[in-house]
Swiss-Prot record:
NCBIfam families found in the cross-reference section: F420_cofD
Annotated organism of origin: Kitasatospora aureofaciens (Streptomyces aureofaciens)
Domain of life: Bacteria
Catalyzed reactions per annotation: enolpyruvoyl-2-diphospho-5'-guanosine + 7,8-didemethyl-8-hydroxy-5-deazariboflavin = dehydro coenzyme F420-0 + GMP + H(+)
PANTHER family: 2-PHOSPHO-L-LACTATE TRANSFERASE (PTHR43007:SF1)
Disulfide bridge map: none
Name assigned to this protein: Phosphoenolpyruvate transferase
TM spans (from-to): none
Key word Magnesium present: yes
EC number(s) per entry: 2.7.8.28
Catalytic EC class: transferase
Length: 321
């Protein structure tokens, strides 16, 4: 079975770990990773979501944080601070720095982000084919109003420095409108047997991937069933700031509203948590097959069961049952 998953960072990576546990060695998983979170720091290109997927599936992630490297040290950051060089609010550890140095060196030498990502994955052996959504530069910005007035800030600043404490007024995936899907992205979607939307942020993760011209259209036109898992449980995000960015695009922070925002033209099936069982009827009335099942990724086995349920729903959709 050929499975394609569109994924952001922590939530996407943890779901993918469960998916790997749920499938067999004969199954092929292609992950189309969000690069809208990418940021340039200290002259280096940092790809937080790609790296989180790579580290998580490769066994190098800081489990408690869900991002960054295990057994990290911070000597470089401390030295940068002594030079008065920031930003202090964004933590890059020494081990993590090495990844960004290799990436930036290869990009400067003329390799594409796709080629660099493939090379980095040779070390980590994540068990999936990891593709960036685009080789072109796309960065998600958030329009806010604070004591400095109305302005746009990089998504990383909005989330890491401001902790999403200010309302998001608009989400702007800068560069997405002129970006092209990375090599292999459209082909993977067209050839997939199943397409999955993990419980990643529907606006700044999956939404940004879909903003690259051609990707949304390819998913909508794909013969494979498309099944998503709600990142919202009981009217609140499991983690992160999905409620803030959903409000910015005029969508309620409910499992039902997120499904309807994707729409029946894009997704065929939708899983909600048992806490949101009341949403099933409304989602199905819109033409999207819906089931209520436990969606908390408490451990790998619980997550694997979520993945198995998503794949089972895809089969039901495929056979019209």
């Amino acid at each position: 079975m050929r499975i394609v998953a569109l994924a952001g960072g922590i939530g996407g990576a943890r779901f993918l770990r469960g998916l790997l546990a749920a499938v067999g060695p004969q199954d092929e998983i292609t992950v189309i990773g969000n690069t809208g979170d990418d940021i340039h720091l200290y002259g280096l290109k940092v790809c937080p979501d790609l790296d989180t997927v790579m580290y998580t599936l490769g066994g190098g992630i800081h489990e408690e944080q869900g991002w960054g490297r295990a057994d990290e040290t911070w000597s470089i950051k401390a030295e940068m601070k002594e030079y008065g060089v920031g930003p202090e609010w964004f933590g890059l550890g020494d081990r993590d720095f090495a990844t960004h140095l290799v990436r930036s060196q290869m990009l400067t030498a003329g390799y594409s982000l796709s080629q660099v990502t493939e090379a980095l994955c040779v070390r980590w052996n994540p068990g999936v084919r990891l593709l960036p959504m685009s080789d072109d530069r796309v960065e998600t910005h958030v329009r806010i109003t604070d004591e400095q007035g109305t302005r746009a800030v990089h998504f990383q600043e909005y989330w890491v420095r401001l902790h999403a404490a200010v309302d998001a007024e608009a989400i702007i995936p800068v560069g997405a409108d002129t970006a092209k899907p990375a090599p292999g992205v459209l082909e993977a979607i067209a050839e997939a047997d199943v397409i999955l939307f993990p419980p990643s942020n529907p606006v700044v993760s999956i939404g940004t991937i879909l903003a690259v011209p051609g990707i949304r259209e390819a998913v909508a036109a794909a013969p494979a069933p498309v099944v998503g898992l709600s990142p919202i449980i009981g009217g609140a995000p499991v983690r992160g700031m999905a409620d803030k960015v959903l409000a910015a695009v005029g969508v309620e922070a409910t499992a039902e509203a997120v499904a309807l925002n994707y729409g029946p033209d894009l997704i065929d099936g939708w899983l909600v948590d048992t806490a949101d069982e009341h949403a099933v009827a409304a989602v199905e009335a819109a033409g999207i097959a819906c089931r209520a099942v436990p969606l908390l990724m408490t451990d790998v086995e619980a997550t694997a069961e979520m993945a198995r349920t998503a794949l089972a729903l895809a089969e039901q959709v495929r056979h019209g049952s």
